[in-house]
């Protein structure tokens, strides 16, 4: 039976075949999905995905309006549309 900490389904199970022929289970953290732009769904650049607690606020996302939510091209379109209204 695995330790209580390893029973969590938030850990990914990897079955590894050992030289003896037996299989062992290795546990590792699941990787988060890449963050995407809310308008065009393209991957966002400059946005960290894993282990966010290790980074400061400025390292997690770009420091501009809608940073970490919209890509730069969609933001430019949005600003142009707001100015032209």
Swiss-Prot record:
Keywords: Ribonucleoprotein, Ribosomal protein. It comes from the Archaea. One of its GO terms (biological process) is translation. The keyword Ribonucleoprotein applies. GO terms for molecular function: structural constituent of ribosome. Pfam families: Ribosomal_L34e. The keyword Ribosomal protein applies. InterPro entries: Ribosomal_eL34, Ribosomal_eL34_C_sf, Ribosomal_eL34_CS, Ribosomal_L34e_arc-type. One of its GO terms (cellular component) is ribonucleoprotein complex. NCBIfam families: PRK04059.1. Belongs to the eukaryotic ribosomal protein eL34 family. This is Large ribosomal subunit protein eL34.
